[in-house]
């Protein structure tokens, strides 16, 4: 039976100490006695924290035993990403097959399943990065983003491709096993395209050279990565990370790819068999991009071997006004919900009128920044109000309409007391 002692010695008046940390009974609040052993309240709390951390670490592994189906993956993507239905289907199937391959590979089989890395093609702000982030969060796997424009061949100024794996390791506290099941998103992949179709005598260290360096990493190799500290401690042994099970998702805007596809289409339909097209038959950029083929990507500047390592291609379309309005209001972490939460913390209700949301969407379309530009527009609109509200304790509601977004008027404030009441525009 455990005995609690609070500031008292034993029956003989002898001073008691915690058997774990060595503190005396006068230095702690409680000292619990067992058979010839004592533990203080601080050590009990520490033990509880250790057990709690271990339970939390093991919980994701237990929860991830069941692999979500492609339909379930798409459903989760729908909660955070608006539109891009075709890309979601392609991604859901590719990710499901990838992680099914990892589980299938754990058993013995004569059939070896190849890895299907993914290429996302779509304009800025269409949701490429968000799709990759959402997938990693849903599957509870380490995730990192790399910028292809900062990469160079080994030996040149810039980041080596191995730095990508080091970033992934940092995300999971250098747990190699976890990192080997992670997801890497390489952004701006179109910026490392070959400068020309013709071989050059000068080295292209940030273009074709990087593609060559990425080849083995994406396909699957054992990368040697310096542990924590990197070059500061060259005597440390390098960590060996097998990239064969890491899912690589590459994304880029590929500006001008539509023209490459059109040229190829026109070449294939020259002569008497060619169909005469009117101006009404002209396709949108999104429709043209959907017809992308391997030869178009090679013509654009990606080397054939690199394209071959990215067999799954998903195209994203430019977001229209309706989609941008949905992005502002519908996802779980929609921008309007975020700002409403911030105002709610001050005890103020924030109301966005429909015409205001459409004005924000139109402004983002004019800037050609897609969904990425929505936050900067909202921030600029609400900045002064967010500065004033904490000092104005009588405000109960703030209303934003189209005139506020255009900069023609200030946000409308409704005060709790009638002395400060101000007219609010009708819907």
UniProtKB/Swiss-Prot annotation:
Protein purpose: ATP-dependent specificity component of the Clp protease. It directs the protease to specific substrates. Can perform chaperone functions in the absence of ClpP.
NCBIfam families attached to this UniProt entry: clpX (TIGR00382), PRK05342.1 (NF003745)
Binding sites annotated in the UniProt record for Zn(2+): 18, 21, 40, 43
Superkingdom of origin: Bacteria
Underlying gene: clpX
Entries under Gene3D superfamilies matching the protein: 1.10.8.60, ClpX chaperone, C4-type zinc finger domain (6.20.220.10), P-loop containing nucleotide triphosphate hydrolases (3.40.50.300)
One function term, GO molecular function aspect: zinc ion binding
GO biological process, one term: cell division
Matching Pfam families: AAA_2, ClpB_D2-small, zf-C4_ClpX
Keywords assigned by UniProt, alphabetized: ATP-binding, Chaperone, Metal-binding, Nucleotide-binding, Zinc
Annotated ClpX-type ZB domain residues: 6-59
Residues that bind ATP: 123-130
GO cellular component terms attached to this protein's record: HslUV protease complex
Source species taxonomy: Bacteria, Pseudomonadati, Pseudomonadota, Gammaproteobacteria, Pseudomonadales
Name under which the protein is recorded: ATP-dependent Clp protease ATP-binding subunit ClpX
Quaternary structure and partners: Component of the ClpX-ClpP complex. Forms a hexameric ring that, in the presence of ATP, binds to fourteen ClpP subunits assembled into a disk-like structure with a central cavity, resembling the structure of eukaryotic proteasomes.
Record organism: Marinobacter nauticus (strain ATCC 700491 / DSM 11845 / VT8) (Marinobacter aquaeolei)
């Amino acid at each position: 039976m455990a005995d609690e002692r609070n500031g008292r010695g034993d029956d003989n008046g002898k001073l008691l100490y915690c058997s774990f940390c060595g503190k005396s009974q006068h230095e702690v609040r409680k000292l619990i006695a067992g058979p010839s052993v004592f533990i203080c309240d601080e050590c009990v709390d520490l033990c509880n924290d250790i057990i709690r951390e271990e339970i939390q670490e093991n919980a994701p592994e237990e929860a991830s035993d069941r692999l979500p189906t492609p339909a379930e993956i798409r459903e989760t993507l729908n909660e955070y990403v608006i539109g891009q239905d075709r890309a979601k289907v392609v991604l859901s199937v590719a990710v499901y097959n990838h992680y099914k391959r990892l589980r299938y590979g754990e058993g013995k089989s004569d059939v070896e399943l190849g890895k299907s890395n993914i290429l996302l093609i779509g304009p800025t702000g269409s949701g490429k990065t968000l799709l990759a982030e959402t997938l990693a969060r849903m599957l509870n796997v380490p995730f990192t983003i790399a910028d292809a424009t900062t990469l160079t061949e080994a030996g040149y100024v810039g980041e080596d491709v191995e730095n990508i794996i080091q970033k992934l390791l940092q995300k999971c506290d250098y747990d190699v096993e976890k990192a080997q099941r992670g997801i890497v998103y390489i952004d701006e992949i179109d910026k490392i395209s070959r400068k020309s179709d013709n071989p050059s005598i000068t080295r292209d260290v940030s273009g074709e050279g990087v593609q060559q360096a990425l080849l083995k990493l994406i396909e699957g190799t054992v990368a040697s990565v310096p542990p924590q500290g990197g070059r500061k401690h060259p005597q440390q042994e390098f960590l060996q990370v097998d990239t064969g099970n890491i899912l690589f998702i590459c994304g880029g805007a590929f500006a001008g790819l539509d023209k490459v596809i059109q040229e190829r289409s026109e070449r294939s339909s020259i002569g008497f068999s060619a169909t005469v097209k009117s101006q009404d038959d002209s396709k949108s950029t999104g429709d043209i991009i959907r017809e992308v083929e391997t030869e178009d990507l090679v013509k654009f500047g990606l080397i054939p071997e690199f394209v071959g390592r990215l067999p799954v291609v998903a195209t994203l379309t430019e977001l229209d006004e309706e989609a941008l309005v949905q992005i502002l209001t519908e996802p779980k972490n929609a921008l309007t919900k975020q700002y409403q939460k911030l105002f709610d913390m001050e005890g103020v209700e924030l109301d966005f009128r429909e015409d205001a949301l459409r004005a924000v969407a139109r402004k983002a379309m004019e800037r050609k920044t897609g969904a990425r530009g929505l936050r900067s527009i909202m921030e600029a609109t609400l900045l002064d109000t967010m500065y004033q509200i904490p000092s104005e304790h009588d405000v109960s509601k703030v209303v934003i309409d189209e005139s506020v977004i255009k900069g023609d008027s200030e946000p409308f404030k409704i005060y709790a007391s009638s002395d400060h009441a101000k007219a609010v525009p009708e819907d």
